[in-house]
Amino acid sequence: MGYLQMGGIGTFSAMALPVPLAPVKMLIQEERGVSFQVGPAFYRRQSSLARDLGILIAAVHRQQTGSLRVLDVMSGCGVRAVRYLLQARADFVWANDACNQLTDLLAQNLSQGHSLDEKSEAVGEEDFERWRITREDAHKVLLDCALRKEYYDLIDVDSFGSDTLCVGPAIGAVKYGGLVYLTSTDGLCAGGRRRHNALSSYGAFVNPMPFANEIGLRMLIGCAVREAATRNMTVTPIFSNYAYHGPVFRTMLRVESRKRLVNKDYGFIVYCKRCGQSQDIQFEDLGDIACCCAYPKEKGSVVVTGPLWIGPLHDRNQVEGMTELAREWGWINSVGARSISNSPVDMHILKELLEVMVDESQPGLPSGYVRMDQIGKRGKVRVPRRKDFIDRLQQEGYAASRSHIEPRAVKTNCPMDQCIELGYGSRSIVIQ
């Protein structure tokens, strides 16, 4: 049973008169035990991992603050909204999608919020006021919220391409201390193939670099940093996630009030094509850009990308909190364990991703990563095993970790020439 709000065109709500819903004929999908129908909406099963991350931090936020009001401005079939409602136990979820054909489908999926869970004995009137559906332009919805001072704990903007129009309004419609979940699928800008598009959409001039997929995350965060600064706010990433299908770049940001932009984590990345060394540069050091390698300098041998985010991609404490909650929910049991809603494969992937995010959060790691095959190519040696190489780097006092973006790479503050030297002393077998 759905609920139709009679007071406005195109607005459906759980807080009004009940009307029967038209049936949507579609095979039922399931994520982590939550069933839903897709209908004519776009749905990608591979993105369920990113939805897992969003649900976990939403639940952690509710535990920490006692409040979770969610605005999902590009809902599609509503799988994210339903999971926020049922799994993160959101107090209220507003699901919006501009497509008129999805309204009944959204209502059908969100009506699961009226069902009794295993521990509930009764449903009060407030349980029927936990969700709302609209079919408005996402940009308009966000601006209206800011104008009415109707702020949310978490705003999910699942956009595609290089559409950053909603980034600023989303930051303006979230509570101080709240979360904004941003998405981009602009692999061409991340790869430096559309530099002027990147400049207009993200405020960064992006040159081709060998860690393009990390650039995709950093330019998206950098865009949010710039938008927040114009509103006397700051944003810092709770976690950032790259997925190869698409590609898809996602980041969950914490929004705080601050009157001045602190630019230590907002700057430029410099890369030397001759030696393969990259470094982070502050605004104050732009006039001193150079590479200290012994190779003769040629025009274009040193390239600069930015301004963008050059700080940590994740908040270690928050990711550890997400990990603990995922373990409590049985989402990351040991491989081989299985619950009704979790396959061993899903559990292993989520567990490994959270572990790598914690590794990537260690202090001292710069932007970018070094692919193992590049070390072998530049040093003219067989490629060392990644794990052995990371152990060797840490023994030498360098920060080093895996990369969740590129499994054949390491993140380290060790200079490239030292990486090559250490590569000679590591176990020389080809990485699989």
Predicted regions and their residues:
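SAM-dependent transferase fold signal centered on methyltransferase-like domains
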Residues: G2-Q432
